Design a protein with these regions (language model features):
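Short, hydrophobic/aliphatic alpha-helical segments
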Residues: 102-116, 227-239
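Extended accessory regions or peripheral subdomains of proteins
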Residues: 1-41, 45-46, 51-91, 129-251
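Short acidic (Asp/Glu) patches
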Residues: 97-114, 137-148
Length: 251
């Protein structure tokens, strides 16, 4: 396998930061983003980004990630940080929940290598509706969270599979991180992860039989407001729209 940069090149690059992308290019004639995703998705939380340029035009890149370095699940009063070894730590949630993600990303000093795709790793996730309270404090916090969803959910990913549709190349990119380890260990760890991903991609897919079952419904749907209250709320929203205060509202 032709892995870049070489060990000697890496020793020079790591002097400019603490995170160097190590990569291997493969011909992508027998693999698609979906087939690759199906092979790596068992490695913990995953993501697949498809590039679309208007309508049905597919853009140049597809990005896949799995086996994140860290996972941040931020709730209103606490944050659960899960490491790659599945160990967990709970910390209080600051007034600005994004501060946790910003501090995490500030700990990395990535080394730029010319010719790399526009995305090779970082923070991938979502911001929930409830986050607006951290920006506009006049917006009240929901009194309940029945689904127990986090306000923020982010994967810190240092391993990314990049499909270059223009060149028909699949690039496996893993960052060598010098976070207290020596350069040789960091480089070898990244190379080993690349080799592990290659082995996953070379594993034949087995299609499993899936039988559909009728869902069991053991409850009766109940509304939380009456029809009269709902109609009144709709009329109020119409007034807001006519006044130019809103363009749409979710009731």
């Amino acid at each position: 396998m032709n892995i870049y940069p070489s060990r000697s090149e890496f020793d020079a690059l790591i002097k400019r930061g603490n995170a160097v992308p190590i990569y291997l290019d493969l011909t992508a004639d027998c693999e698609t983003p979906l087939s690759a995703y199906s092979k790596i998705r068992e490695n913990g939380p995953t993501f697949l980004f498809e590039s679309i340029v208007g309508g049905e035009r597919i853009s140049r890149y597809s990005f896949l990630g799995a086996n994140p370095r860290k996972i941040y699940r931020v709730f209103s009063d606490h944050c659960i940080i899960t490491e790659k070894d599945h160990s967990e730590m709970t910390v209080p949630t600051p007034a600005d929940p994004l501060q946790l993600i910003e501090e995490e990303m500030a700990s990395y000093v990535p080394v730029h290598i010319p010719g790399m795709p526009p995305f090779i790793g970082g923070a991938v996730g979502f911001v929930g509706h409830e986050f607006i309270h951290s920006v506009e404090t006049t917006v009240p916090k929901p009194s309940k969270n029945p689904l127990e969803l986090p306000v923020l959910y982010y994967l810190i990913t240092d391993s990314v599979l990049i499909f270059d549709h223009a060149k028909q190349v699949l690039r496996i990119c893993v960052h060598a991180l010098c976070d207290g380890t020596d350069t040789e260990t960091a480089y070898n760890k990244a190379v080993s992860e690349i080799e592990r991903i290659v082995a996953l991609l070379q594993t034949p897919q087995t299609l499993t039989h899936c039988s559909l079952q009728e869902p069991k419904i053991d409850s009766v749907p109940e509304g939380n407001i009456s029809q009269k209250e709902f109609v009144a709320a709709v009329e109020k929203v119409k007034d807001y729209i006519r006044a130019g205060d809103v363009i749409q509202t979710v009731l």
